[in-house]
């Protein structure tokens, strides 16, 4: 993708860099092959693989059942929990949702469901900017539909700019 630092991004010279690039280069070296890096908009990343435009995807992609129906995954190589980001001066900046530091949606019991309910109440009427075709968009549609106004973006950098400009309450 080239737009998801620190995992992958284009530097000022237009070259890909980041943790996934380093990881991929090391894998190519160990396999004794030359790898060519290409960028692809996120919402087309799986379709382009299926069309044979490249051989593998190395991207901050969560392994979901829906995606597993289309492509094969290796063992995950990195984990990064999802979270909301808001401006420091936002009323949302100091939320304490059910006293929980994190909520595991894969094992959402009563306490997790209560936390999601509190989050929905706190975010009611807010605008949340999110990259399209992501698990984050799926979360908003599943858990916060009707409570928040969702604005979709092609790249993380774009929604971050809108957060900084005050055009959304959270990303």
What are these regions (language model features)?
Residues 43-47, 60-70, 138-143, 157, ...:
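A ligand-binding cleft/hinge motif common to bilobed small-molecule-binding domains
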Residues 101, 140, 149-151:
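A residue-level marker of the well-folded mature domains of exported/periplasmic proteins
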Residues 1-4, 42-43, 52-54, 61-64, ...:
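Solvent-exposed coil/turn segments that connect beta secondary-structure elements
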Residues 1-61, 69, 152-153:
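Extracytoplasmic small-molecule ligand-binding "clamshell" domains
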Residues 49, 120-123, 163:
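Short hydrophobic patches on amphipathic alpha-helices
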Residues 4-10, 66, 92-94, 138-139:
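Short, solvent-exposed loop/turn elements at domain surfaces
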